[in-house]
């Protein structure tokens, strides 16, 4: 094991974080009040009760049911700004230096909140985080795969200007995985890439779905990153391909345990991925719901993989930087920061 002080100081990049998934109970209830939103009768009545319910998810769908109720309290640009700013202030104390952030506009547009409102609120928080906290960030618009692909295509058309201008830096695919394979979204990804050939592409795959979902995301959607991807372990051929192409897997340890993908963090094939030279980063996914932000994930992995030394953690940090979608100059700055922290602890 390495000292937790080292992990705290180690510069971190987060690539798998849903902004709506950072909605803590102590922000959810004030926003509901501010916007006169009536929460469902079966919904817990206090932040404390809700926090307890968040410890009891049976699977991905059980979590999603609560996640989508939570999004109902977000209505105005200010709400989205407050949500993202609360995330940035938390992680600024955890060694986070760069974040690539998912958001789900369809959770909001289906309620009559415009895509522009959502995006501008988040974008303002990203700018403030850069100016005041020194954290760089990119926004990744996700399509909800449980909605009809035609609706997803419509969302891409609505986002055309934001994609063209680069405010939306990447496209992702999330929500319930198993019933909705990548093949349903080929047209969506092709259209988005046509609007802006520089748009970065990723997709959730291989969390509850098999390794075939990962291969299909690579082959059919032309993604250059895989979100989760833990079931890639099922195929030697796929693992060799991921290693050769240095495709980043954005792994979410505490999330995988919370949603019963694995029983413990030890079961996540992180050592296998290291042995196979597959690049991965460690991320928090939906931290308000899963009881852990990025540093909590680093601490838990450190406990469950006690043989990992400074060299291994240096490699993970650098893989995260090299796999990021920030500019080369920023990558070089961050790599130098990692070197400085490693040198401090190993010299």
UniProtKB/Swiss-Prot annotation:
GO cellular component: cytosol; nucleus
Known cofactor(s): Zn(2+)
Gene name per UniProt: AAH1
Domain of life: Eukaryota
Pfam families for the chain: A_deaminase (PF00962)
Family annotation (InterPro entries): A/AMP_deam_AS, A_deaminase_dom, ADE, Ado/ade_deaminase, Metal_Hydrolase
Record-listed Zn(2+) binding positions: 16, 18, 204, 285
Family under the similarity heading: Belongs to the metallo-dependent hydrolases superfamily. Adenosine and AMP deaminases family. Adenine deaminase type 2 subfamily.
PROSITE patterns tied to this protein: A_DEAMINASE
Residues annotated to bind substrate: 286
Keywords: Cytoplasm, Hydrolase, Metal-binding, Nucleotide metabolism, Nucleus, Zinc
Protein name, entry field: Adenine deaminase
Organism: Candida glabrata (strain ATCC 2001 / BCRC 20586 / JCM 3761 / NBRC 0622 / NRRL Y-65 / CBS 138) (Yeast)
GO molecular function: adenine deaminase activity; zinc ion binding
EC category name: hydrolase
Site positions for Important for catalytic activity: 228
Subcellular location: Cytoplasm; Nucleus
Taxonomic classification: Eukaryota, Fungi, Dikarya, Ascomycota, Saccharomycotina
Cofactor binding notes: Binds 1 zinc ion per subunit.
PANTHER family: ADENINE DEAMINASE (PTHR43114:SF6)
Annotated catalysed reactions: adenine + H2O + H(+) = hypoxanthine + NH4(+)
Function: Catalyzes the hydrolytic deamination of adenine to hypoxanthine. Plays an important role in the purine salvage pathway and in nitrogen catabolism.
Catalytic residues as annotated in Swiss-Prot or TrEMBL: 207
EC number: 3.5.4.2
GO biological process per UniProt: adenine catabolic process; hypoxanthine salvage; IMP salvage
């Amino acid at each position: 094991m390495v000292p937790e002080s080292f992990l705290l100081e180690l510069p971190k990049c987060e690539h798998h974080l849903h902004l709506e998934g950072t909605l803590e109970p102590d922000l959810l209830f004030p926003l509901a009040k501010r916007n006169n939103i009536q929460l469902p009768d079966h919904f817990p009545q206090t932040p404390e009760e809700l926090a307890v319910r968040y410890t009891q998810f049976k699977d991905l769908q059980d979590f999603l049911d609560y996640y989508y109720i939570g999004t109902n309290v977000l209505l105005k640009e200010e709400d989205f700004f407050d949500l993202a700013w609360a995330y940035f202030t938390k992680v600024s104390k955890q060694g986070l230096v760069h974040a690539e952030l998912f958001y789900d506009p369809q959770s909001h547009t289906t309620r009559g909140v415009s895509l522009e409102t959502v995006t501008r609120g988040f974008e303002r928080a990203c700018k403030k985080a850069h100016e005041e906290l020194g954290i760089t960030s990119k926004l990744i618009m996700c399509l909800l795969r449980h909605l009809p692909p035609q609706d997803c295509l419509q969302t891409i058309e609505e986002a055309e200007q934001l994609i063209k201008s680069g405010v939306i830096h990447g496209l992702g695919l999330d929500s319930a995985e198993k019933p909705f394979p990548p093949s349903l979204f080929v047209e969506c990804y092709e259209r988005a890439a046509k609007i802006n050939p520089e748009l970065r592409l990723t997709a959730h795959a291989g969390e509850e779905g098999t390794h075939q979902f990962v291969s299909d995301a690579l082959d059919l959607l032309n993604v250059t990153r895989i979100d989760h991807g833990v079931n890639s372990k099922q195929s030697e051929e796929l693992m060799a391909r991921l290693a050769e192409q240095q495709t980043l897997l954005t792994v979410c340890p505490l999330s995988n345990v919370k949603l019963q993908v694995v029983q413990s963090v030890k079961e996540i094939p992180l050592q296998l991925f290291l042995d196979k030279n597959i690049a991965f980063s460690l991320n928090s996914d939906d931290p308000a719901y899963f009881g852990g932000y990025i540093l909590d994930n680093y601490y838990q992995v450190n406990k469950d993989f006690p043989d990992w030394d400074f060299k291994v953690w240096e490699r993970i940090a650098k893989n995260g930087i090299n796999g990021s979608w920030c500019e080369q100059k920023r990558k070089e700055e961050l790599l130098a920061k990692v070197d400085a922290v490693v040198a401090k602890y190993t010299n």
